[in-house]
Amino acid sequence: MSFDINWNKINEDSTINQRARAFLNEHLESLQLPSYVSNIKMTDFKLGTIPPRITLKQIDNPLDDFYEALRLEGASIGGRDTDVQFLMEVDYKGDMLIELSAELVLNYPSPNFMQLPVKLTISDIGIHSLCLVAYLQRQLFISFLCDVSDPALDNVESPLDSNGPAFLGSKAVERISLIRSIKIQTEIGPQDLSEGTILRSVGKLEQFLSDVFKNLLRKEAAWPSWINLDFNEDVSADVESSSSAEESLPHRDDAQDFSADARA
């Protein structure tokens, strides 16, 4: 079963781009940079106009691991009637664009002999993996299990234990690339000069950034890790907003409806 995604609505949500920039900049600031680069930061993030192709493989109850994560956070576990988990095949070959700035450090003939401004553009990101998406207690958990072409899973119908919702193994991160392809273009030097100041394809820097993004996504989103989106925060904000509106307009009754449509 395949799904059509209203990608335009997602792409128009400015908070997604803002959160992506904040998250990646926080990670970049924590990196121990090699001696030939400094002051690296993200300057722009565009989700792109091309959506992933998603195929539903299985519907099941959420893994116990997700409930345990909620318990550790101190969240109360209510009824499970609306909790659900999907196993999906995600095929993404879109036009996401990431731009970064940095300074290339020349350490010859002496340390920090020269620093050149660098502009880096990351594009052509390709992902083709199996992914778990679980919705429980108004929270969404997303975790990538394996690359579709992984030979270790060629003869396995599902990475879920047939006797219950328990994932087989806890070291999937060791056998998943997740980002299968990535293109990095580098420009070095002042952008207003035209001769001899712009260098392209700086191999070491591009390889470093490629490894950074691949390792980051595997660390944060590949099983046994996951991305967690908490919609309870949005509900709390809506409640506070409604309370303020009722105080200013005591005779007005407000109602909010939420609906989500997926075309199979």
Curated annotation (Swiss-Prot):
Record bears the keyword Endoplasmic reticulum: yes
Compartments where found: Mitochondrion outer membrane; Endoplasmic reticulum membrane
Keyword Endoplasmic reticulum: yes
InterPro entries: Mdm12 (IPR027532), MMM1_dom (IPR019411), SMP_LBD (IPR031468)
Annotated Pfam families: MMM1
Gene Ontology biological-process annotations: aminophospholipid transport; mitochondrial genome maintenance; mitochondrial outer membrane translocase complex assembly; mitochondrion inheritance; mitochondrion-endoplasmic reticulum membrane tethering; peroxisome organization; phospholipid transport; protein insertion into mitochondrial outer membrane
Membrane topology, as annotated: Peripheral membrane protein
GO cellular component: endoplasmic reticulum membrane; ERMES complex
Annotated spans, Disordered: 240-264
Domain of life: Eukaryota
Primary site of residence: mitochondrion
UniProt keywords, alphabetically: Endoplasmic reticulum, Lipid transport, Lipid-binding, Membrane, Mitochondrion, Mitochondrion outer membrane, Transport
Gene Ontology MF: a single term: lipid transfer activity
Domain SMP-LTD per the UniProt entry, residue ranges: 1-232
Compositional bias ranges of the Basic and acidic residues kind: 248-264
Task performed by this protein: Component of the ERMES/MDM complex, which serves as a molecular tether to connect the endoplasmic reticulum (ER) and mitochondria. Components of this complex are involved in the control of mitochondrial shape and protein biogenesis, and function in nonvesicular lipid trafficking between the ER and mitochondria. MDM12 is required for the interaction of the ER-resident membrane protein MMM1 and the outer mitochondrial membrane-resident beta-barrel protein MDM10.
Domain notes: The SMP-LTD domain is a barrel-like domain that can bind various types of glycerophospholipids in its interior and mediate their transfer between two adjacent bilayers.
Subunit structure: Component of the ER-mitochondria encounter structure (ERMES) or MDM complex, composed of MMM1, MDM10, MDM12 and MDM34. A MMM1 homodimer associates with one molecule of MDM12 on each side in a pairwise head-to-tail manner, and the SMP-LTD domains of MMM1 and MDM12 generate a continuous hydrophobic tunnel for phospholipid trafficking.
Similarity field: Belongs to the MDM12 family.
Name the UniProt record assigns to this protein: Mitochondrial distribution and morphology protein 12
Originating species: Eremothecium gossypii (strain ATCC 10895 / CBS 109.51 / FGSC 9923 / NRRL Y-1056)
